[in-house]
């Protein structure tokens, strides 16, 4: 019916019941649950980036790369999935251990060549199976690094390039609450992308609801237009469409945001 089906895939980590963890894990109490051992050929003993949940995959390991490609192949060839949204793509580096000079958080948020290379490799493999496959990264990093993917193979036919999540929550918060805000970052051009590969959004599962903040912190300077008023706050939420969906390029829309969902 012309509707693309896109999966959210978390290939940066797995949890302790994963068989690739359980075959090489620390399990002193013998309950079948533990963290990866130093011998594990898939997982890092400790996370190599600052936003880890679960157990951190080592994407420089050939076995891990083979596993990821098998997952990609299964979904594309068997289920004809149209694209993947890759969770936490910042986690695909081996360069940022806890004791790294300058701090793990700073390292994770700066340009890492190993991460650029391995994610291009996975994108290439996806496109080799389906040249029209949608590749989307939840990276939320520097423009310099994101440009490496957004502009990658953009001139090919069909045009490729990775779509990058664009978190504009703070800016839209200020705008919707009735304060001065700059939402220029919603455009691909503002980030140095050659084509429209920014998937901008005002709200996601990771932030407080915009509607909640309208009611709690909205601008009350003008008594005739008090943003804390429910009807006014709701009207501002519906305006999200007018000020974001018309910006060229793909968008991510959080469930019922335009109707004032605040739970």
Model-predicted segments: where are they?
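Substrate-binding/active-site clefts of carbohydrate-active enzymes
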Residues: 1-111, 122-130
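Conserved alpha/beta catalytic core and glycan-binding cleft of carbohydrate-active enzymes
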Residues: 80, 106, 112-262
């Amino acid at each position: 019916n012309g509707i693309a089906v896109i999966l959210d895939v978390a290939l940066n980590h797995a949890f302790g019941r994963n068989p690739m963890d359980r075959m090489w894990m620390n399990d002193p109490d013998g309950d079948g649950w533990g963290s990866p051992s130093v011998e594990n050929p898939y997982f890092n003993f400790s996370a190599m980036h600052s936003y880890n949940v679960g157990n951190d995959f080592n994407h420089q390991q050939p076995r891990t790369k083979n596993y990821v490609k098998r997952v990609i192949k299964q979904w594309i060839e068997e289920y004809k999935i149209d694209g993947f949204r890759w969770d936490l793509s910042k986690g695909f580096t081996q360069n940022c251990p806890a004791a790294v000079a300058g701090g793990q958080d700073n390292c994770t948020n700066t340009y890492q060549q190993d991460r650029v290379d391995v994610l291009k490799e996975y994108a290439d493999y996806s496109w080799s199976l389906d040249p029209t496959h949608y590749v989307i990264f939840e990276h939320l990093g520097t423009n310099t690094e994101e440009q490496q993917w957004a502009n990658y193979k953009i001139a090919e036919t069909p045009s490729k390039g990775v779509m990058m999540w664009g978190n504009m929550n703070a800016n839209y918060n200020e705008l919707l609450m009735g304060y001065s805000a700059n939402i220029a970052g919603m455009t691909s051009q503002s980030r140095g992308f050659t084509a429209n590969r920014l998937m901008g959004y005002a709200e996601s599962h990771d932030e407080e609801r915009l509607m909640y903040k309208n009611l709690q912190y909205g601008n009350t300077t003008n008594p005739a237009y008090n943003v804390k008023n429910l009807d006014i706050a709701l009207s501002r939420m519906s305006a999200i469409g007018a000020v974001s969906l018309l910006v060229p390029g793909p968008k991510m829309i959080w469930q019922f945001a335009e109707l004032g969902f605040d739970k």
